[in-house]
């Protein structure tokens, strides 16, 4: 008797349960006896609820700012980026990598090396580079280090806030403030060779300061030990490699690059390009290897997926990544002068004849920074910190455990005319030399750059990391490994040297890396003579090719050209040669406007945000409220 009644009740009850999750009861039969106006209001209410329910289940897009602070060898500056971020229920928050754009670079402030050296000058005492220092005693001065870090971070924070306020509209500011701003502060070669605990302590302090910004401006900065830290030379190169290939759209999940083999396994070829990045204190060389490349057992290739530089969904690639200290433009200039002018072939009667300087150019015999005056004379900065040998001379001290306990490191210093047992001033001094004169002999310049910097008998000092990768010098890189991948060369001085030769029509505008064409052009340019005009010194080119003002940026440009020629010759001598070589500062988008400068900054963002699950979790675990 109960069954005919019970079943219909179940059916009716089931329908009523489905209403909140479906159409909200749009069956017209449920509205019998209701007038048209009431029915209209009912439908409006249902539609409103359905709209709100849809909002709960759909993805939401907003803008997020990201700050990368480049703590380089000469200065510290912010790079402020903007990106589209998407949050989806049960999927976390992700960033669209193609939306990342640089909105502005900040001002240049004090480098981290200066912060540490000023602290050591005060609390370890003057000449700490030339005597034993018990580093344990310096723990008592951590509060003072904190104050020095705070002064720098206040400047960086104010500069970042000024950029955000000037570049974002009001709606964007609301979104950026609500999400918080991840900060990635990375030091490169400037403090890479700093020994003892000082460097790591400074980064603990910097992270604390980032996570506790001023509340007045409303922006909530936050970081963690993975985002704010010293990065190795190999990492710096790999991040620059990722930047290049992302901006040039070689890096991605393009189905056209993939195929499924007979076993159903997906294989994706990579069309990646290599990069040579020359900074102030170091140079990085990174390029992909072809499948089947056989490397010596001592050489370590990096797999982008295995080392968690890229997620598994990207095409797999093995790359060579090596970084050389003392091969940056500033550091190599100091080392080159020290070695060249300690050689009897070039030092006669207190005068060092430098084949990499223009004829008629003179300076005092020092590795200090040079300023070319309007009267044509060269003023050399006597400030110890402005001496381009200072970082290397500090490293090459018998009081550095890396030197005192490792004989090979001491030999490398002595090979480069630096005696670790002498005081700092003597380690930076060029013995028996008073004047440096330019001779403008480019071929001899190339041979000296080759023997001192590119293919020295012993590895350049402070290059333990490069040696651990299997390469003791640049010439070994292309002897042991090579690639047909395109190569992009970047770095201010490297670009300036090529642009200068093009400006004087010594190189074709479409120059693509022919080494003999470059050598011939540089040979003619570097044979120029310095002439003093009424409006200042100029470089007078031979064969009536015109002239160019001499200044502090181009007086030693020929050494850069020689380094480029030497580099290209070694690339050409490898088993495989690059398909083409280009010199680029940035990569342009479809509209012809630069997307961002080449360098490691975009790459370090991608390295973190492409691992979407990890990024979404970390961005909240290390968010502003976590650090209150």
UniProtKB/Swiss-Prot annotation:
GO biological process: nucleoside diphosphate catabolic process
Pfam families, A to Z: GDA1_CD39 (PF01150)
Disulfide bond entries: none
Subcellular location: Secreted; Parasitophorous vacuole
The entry's keywords: Glycoprotein, Hydrolase, Secreted, Signal
Active site: 236 (proton acceptor)
GO CC terms in record: membrane; symbiont-containing vacuole
EC class (word): hydrolase
Signal peptide from the UniProt entry: 1-25
Keyword DNA-binding: no
Cited Gene3D superfamilies: 3.30.420.530, 3.30.420.540
Phenotype for residue 91 to R: In strain: Beverley
A GO MF term: ribonucleoside triphosphate phosphatase activity
EC number: 3.6.1.15
Consequence when changing residue 101 to R: In strain: Beverley
Family designation: Belongs to the GDA1/CD39 NTPase family.
UniProt name for this protein: Nucleoside-triphosphatase 2
Organism name: Toxoplasma gondii
